[in-house]
């Protein structure tokens, strides 16, 4: 909270961590940025939010599987630390943080990833068909994000170069 208040007081923008839910942005981040801005006699609407998003695209479950697994692993990794684990509790997924922390210490990466259910993934990522991805990004972040960064996209393109034009279409749709 302190750094969000400081950003509200002093900064032109905030680069949000990819491990976020809209609940976190709405109920934790934005109020603190607004408090800092108010303390400095600034308007918080002038502070830009750059938001990396775990975006998992594909026209079939099979096509999305690799990116879903990667996003779940990242969410589990970040969520295993106290700095991010509270977000699970905020969403009603109690005791996920301590479970992830224990599994991380044990080095059980398969169980770590399996702890992040599809329901949890949907809170921290956008999972969609290619044709729906831009609309889902816009629906979730319009009026909140100044910029969206699709996290893990470079990795996806590295695995599947044919996806580059599709990610380009999404970027154009989101920025238009």
Predicted regions mapped to residue ranges:
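Active-site-adjacent structural elements that line small-molecule/cofactor binding pockets in enzymes
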Residues: 1-176
């Amino acid at each position: 909270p302190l750094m969000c208040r400081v950003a509200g007081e002093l900064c032109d923008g905030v680069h949000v961590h990819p491990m976020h839910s809209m609940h976190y942005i709405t109920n934790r981040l934005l109020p603190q940025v607004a408090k800092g801005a108010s303390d400095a006699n600034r308007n918080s609407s002038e502070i830009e939010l750059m938001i990396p998003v775990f975006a998992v695209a594909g026209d079939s479950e099979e096509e999305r599987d690799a990116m879903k697994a990667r996003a779940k692993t990242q969410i589990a990794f970040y969520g295993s630390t106290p700095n991010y684990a509270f977000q699970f509790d905020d969403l009603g997924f109690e005791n996920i943080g301590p479970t992830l922390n224990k599994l991380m210490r044990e080095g059980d990466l398969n169980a770590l990833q399996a702890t992040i259910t599809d329901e949890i993934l949907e809170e921290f990522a956008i999972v969609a068909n290619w044709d729906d991805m831009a609309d889902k990004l816009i629906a979730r972040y319009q009026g909140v994000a100044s910029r969206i960064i699709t996290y893990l996209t470079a990795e996806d393109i590295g695995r599947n170069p044919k996806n580059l034009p599709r990610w380009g279409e999404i970027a154009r749709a989101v920025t238009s």
